[in-house]
Amino acid sequence: MGSQGSVSFTDVTVDFTQEEWEQLDPSQRILYMDVMLENYSNLLSVEVWKADGQVERDPRDLQRQVGSLTTIKNQPPTEERGSRFGKTLTLNTDFVSLRQVPYKYDLYEKTLKYNSDLLSSRNCVRKKGDGCGGFGEPLLYLKQEKPHAGLEYSEYNGNGRALSHKDAIFKHRKIKSLVQPFVCNYCDKTFSFKSLLVSHKRIHTGEKPYECDVCQKTFSHKANLIKHQRIHTGEKPFECPECGKAFTHQSNLIVHQRAHMEKKPYGCSECGKTFAQKFELTTHQRIHTGERPYECNECAKTFFKKSNLIIHQKIHTGEKRYECSECGKSFIQNSQLIIHRRTHTGEKPYECTECGKTFSQRSTLRLHLRIRTGEKPYECAECGKAFSRKSRLSVHQRVHMA
């Protein structure tokens, strides 16, 4: 980008004559000050700041440019006026005077040290007066016997926290008039709406007011309950546009879509199979290592996956929460109910590409394909005989055990 000419405060200043100024009503004068402060803030934000928080330029130059923004409540205009503005701003408010600073400009040492103790200090008090520049929000003044003059009033927001040097006071006043912050009394986090604060506080209190009417599991947020209930209803609103596969949660769809994008960065060192997520690789590697870290405390049966253990434990508890609305038969898993429903509807979504035969279950299609291909993946460790089905291998192994 080519070099741009430097912009001074004069370039963005609008001057009035004394007669013109006196014809402005209070709201117009406030607007004028807002615009001037905005321009001033924008110029400051692009300055080169030193490590100690000072601006690299002659402070007296700023004094000449900014002039005077004095606000004296219920008093006639002061005779002192800045050389650039051409008049003194007199507003019927409680703004701190910018002109009270000594000529040598303590401003840079005290007020605009944005990384100084001024920013970290929270020793401030809300001062009620005519409000925040006519917008109805009181400003925060530093709680000191002799408050610093200058821009201190723009340094704090409604949470007692310092605004950055890029935040002009005009933004603070207008935003504060629209958004009242709600502060968490546990962690000081702030929110735009009270409902968000109420919801957030449940993290600290542990409150879970939303209960599933099917399994009585409770949740702190209604959105989480809605997501959970999809397990019971079988609803899968998130569909892959590539293959049509549907998912209960959007996060699962995002993971699935990586398969289409061929982003599987996690590879198995044993067989070379790749996975989209690291936990999938970790689970897969247990096939090679034989590790089964999840054990049933009822029968001591072990499992590769925790989800398989949870499903298995329902056999012991007798829990069957998924009921068929057609015949009343209940099932441990929702997937079992979906398959069962096909007996009523006659749906057979899985088709053999070789012969066109259809099946209600994917597993049945796989078995059918093995018959056609002659594949026998289940091999006996004793004699080497292979089978197309695992159940037939189990029956065969009894011969060796006899």
Curated annotation (Swiss-Prot):
There is a cross-link at K73, K113, K143 (Glycyl lysine isopeptide (Lys-Gly) (interchain with G-Cter in SUMO2)). Pfam families: KRAB, zf-C2H2. The keyword Transcription applies. GO terms for biological process: regulation of DNA-templated transcription. SMART domains: KRAB (SM00349), ZnF_C2H2 (SM00355). Gene3D superfamilies: 6.10.140.140, Classic Zinc Finger. Keywords: DNA-binding, Isopeptide bond, Metal-binding, Nucleus, Repeat, Transcription, Transcription regulation, Ubl conjugation, Zinc, Zinc-finger. One of its GO terms (cellular component) is nucleus. GO terms for molecular function: DNA binding; zinc ion binding. A zinc finger (C2H2-type) spans 182-204, 210-232, 238-260, 266-288, 294-316, 322-344, 350-372, 378-400. Residues 7-83 form the KRAB domain. Residues 1-165 are annotated as: Required for correct nuclear localization and exclusion from the nucleoli. It comes from the Eukaryota. CDD domains: KRAB_A-box. It is found in: Nucleus. May be involved in transcriptional regulation. Belongs to the krueppel C2H2-type zinc-finger protein family. PANTHER family: RIKEN CDNA 6720489N17 GENE-RELATED (PTHR23234:SF10), ZNF44 PROTEIN (PTHR23234). This is Zinc finger protein 1. It comes from Mus musculus (Mouse). The gene is Zfp1.
